[in-house]
Amino acid sequence: MRIGQYQLRNRLIAAPMAGITDRPFRTLCYEMGAGLTVSEMMSSNPQVWESDKSRLRMVHIDEPGIRTVQIAGSDPKEMADAARINVESGAQIIDINMGCPAKKVNRKLAGSALLQYPDVVKSILTEVVNAVDVPVTLKIRTGWAPEHRNCEEIAQLAEDCGIQALTIHGRTRACLFNGEAEYDSIRAVKQKVSIPVIANGDITDPLKARAVLDYTGADALMIGRAAQGRPWIFREIQHYLDTGELLPPLPLAEVKRLLCAHVRELHDFYGPAKGYRIARKHVSWYLQEHAPNDQFRRTFNAIEDASEQLEALEAYFENFA
């Protein structure tokens, strides 16, 4: 699959997730088989660009793979400026967020709230596409509410504005993450436009990935929550798509290696004073199937020292040896 001038190595994309797809996680997903990874959502508000949080979220030239940054906002000029700044910092693809259902984002008329206003959508897409010389992509939901699904209209508008690829999450904004994703809307969009269409939502295992590709005709898949604590899902899915065979479960020793390496990277990236806090949620996700009684996770979350976290993980896995 191609996005503009860039050829992806496969059809699996790690979704942008606020507070999750930081540089350590993106790098790990890429190493585990993702063909593309997308940064956390970056605000287009220039007042926050110099904050520590924004600087950490920006991509850098030495990151592996095709460097892709997602931006969010409602002002066309600010969005264009944000795109330019991120390209200057190393972004090779700009993705526009019109899919986030969070209230704090929607209250600012950003994210999926924009789907209610196609004229504003058109203005934003036009400004951003004209502002940069790299491919611009768009992520949306199927609409604002089940009774207001307008993804076909938005998709056609996006193609007309020069968007190079479109990701669709198979829920409306009103659905949040409740219920099941539906793929009829994604299938309809794929039949309507000629730009690449990427299916997103509830793609949790290799069999589901194959089924969604076959049903929708999508060019690629974007995987988000299913990769939390399981970044090797990209390798599992790609192997199944290539061979029709399922890989055996990842050995516990490999889970330990990946988890401990991930935690060390978080400590290094954020610094010991903040890294241990960020690591807590990732450790919880990794250990969901190994620590069902939550006792270790409760103990781990009380640790306030980076080195003690690693010692606790070593001791935890020794109990399974």
UniProtKB/Swiss-Prot annotation:
<dbReference type="InterPro" id="IPR001269">
    <property type="entry name" value="DUS_fam"/>
</dbReference>
<dbReference type="GO" id="GO:0009314">
    <property type="term" value="P:response to radiation"/>
</dbReference>
<dbReference type="InterPro" id="IPR018517">
    <property type="entry name" value="tRNA_hU_synthase_CS"/>
</dbReference>
<dbReference type="InterPro" id="IPR032887">
    <property type="entry name" value="DusB"/>
</dbReference>
<dbReference type="InterPro" id="IPR024036">
    <property type="entry name" value="tRNA-dHydroUridine_Synthase_C"/>
</dbReference>
<keyword id="KW-0288">FMN</keyword>
<protein>
    <recommendedName>
        <fullName>tRNA-dihydrouridine synthase B</fullName>
        <ecNumber>1.3.1.-</ecNumber>
    </recommendedName>
</protein>
<dbReference type="InterPro" id="IPR004652">
    <property type="entry name" value="DusB-like"/>
</dbReference>
<keyword id="KW-0521">NADP</keyword>
<dbReference type="GO" id="GO:0000049">
    <property type="term" value="F:tRNA binding"/>
</dbReference>
<keyword id="KW-0285">Flavoprotein</keyword>
<dbReference type="GO" id="GO:0010181">
    <property type="term" value="F:FMN binding"/>
</dbReference>
<feature type="binding site">
    <location>
        <begin position="16"/>
        <end position="18"/>
    </location>
    <ligand>
        <name>FMN</name>
    </ligand>
</feature>
<dbReference type="GO" id="GO:0050660">
    <property type="term" value="F:flavin adenine dinucleotide binding"/>
</dbReference>
<feature type="binding site">
    <location>
        <position position="139"/>
    </location>
    <ligand>
        <name>FMN</name>
    </ligand>
</feature>
<keyword id="KW-0820">tRNA-binding</keyword>
<comment type="similarity">
    <text>Belongs to the Dus family. DusB subfamily.</text>
</comment>
<keyword id="KW-0694">RNA-binding</keyword>
<feature type="active site" description="Proton donor">
    <location>
        <position position="100"/>
    </location>
</feature>
<dbReference type="InterPro" id="IPR013785">
    <property type="entry name" value="Aldolase_TIM"/>
</dbReference>
<keyword id="KW-0560">Oxidoreductase</keyword>
<dbReference type="InterPro" id="IPR035587">
    <property type="entry name" value="DUS-like_FMN-bd"/>
</dbReference>
<keyword id="KW-0819">tRNA processing</keyword>
<comment type="function">
    <text>Catalyzes the synthesis of 5,6-dihydrouridine (D), a modified base found in the D-loop of most tRNAs, via the reduction of the C5-C6 double bond in target uridines.</text>
</comment>
<feature type="binding site">
    <location>
        <begin position="224"/>
        <end position="225"/>
    </location>
    <ligand>
        <name>FMN</name>
    </ligand>
</feature>
<dbReference type="GO" id="GO:0017150">
    <property type="term" value="F:tRNA dihydrouridine synthase activity"/>
</dbReference>
<feature type="binding site">
    <location>
        <begin position="200"/>
        <end position="202"/>
    </location>
    <ligand>
        <name>FMN</name>
    </ligand>
</feature>
<feature type="binding site">
    <location>
        <position position="70"/>
    </location>
    <ligand>
        <name>FMN</name>
    </ligand>
</feature>
<dbReference type="Pfam" id="PF01207">
    <property type="entry name" value="Dus"/>
</dbReference>
